[in-house]
Amino acid sequence: MKNLRNIKKVPFEIGQLLANNKRFCSFLVDDTNNPGDVSMSFIELLNEKYITIYPPVEDGAIEQHNRNTYAIILLDSISTADSDANIGVSGNIYITTDVNHILLTENRNRLLEMADEVLQTLDNAKLTSAGEIHINHISHTMITTFRAGYRISFTLSDQQIERAEI
């Protein structure tokens, strides 16, 4: 039987996996040129709005103006037509920063390094809530005139064999 009970947990599990990556957290929290490893829990990152599971916008601007860099995890499409047991799920992770914080020392691109951390952390990772996550592509996007970002598109597979709950 098809059930969205586990699917709705996916953004939280993705956020938890990203929170476990100290390098990824350092790019979110530390806007200096050479951020050191930062360790924060997923709940702390959610509470401080470094990671969100819904678009944190109000009139085109992020609610927390002091957040230079943040990540948004969204499930964009849920299709129940794929099979009897499997629910087709795709989504995006947006990572964004303001134009003043894109480059690090030696012209390293903060957002590309963050995208690489997402790719290394999530591609082919097994989620206890809903199968396996696959990163399909990464594309650049301008969020506003002053904010640049990357959209990291993913799909889930093999949900029907997963029964664990978070």
Spans of model-derived segments:
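Acidic, Ser/Thr- and Gly-enriched intrinsically disordered low-complexity segments
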Residues: 36, 58-72, 100-117, 122-123
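Hydrophobic residues positioned within well-ordered beta-strands of beta-sheet architectures
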Residues: 71, 89-93, 150-152
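Generic short beta-strand segments
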Residues: 75-78, 96, 156-159
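Residue-level signal for secondary-structure boundary sites
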Residues: 81, 101-103, 160-164
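Short, solvent-exposed beta-strand/turn "edge" segments of beta-rich domains on protein surfaces
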Residues: 81-86, 143-147
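Short acidic, glycine/tyrosine-flanked loop/strand segments centered on an H-E-D-like triad
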Residues: 86-103
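Acidic-leaning, charged glycine-interspersed low-complexity segments
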Residues: 109-166
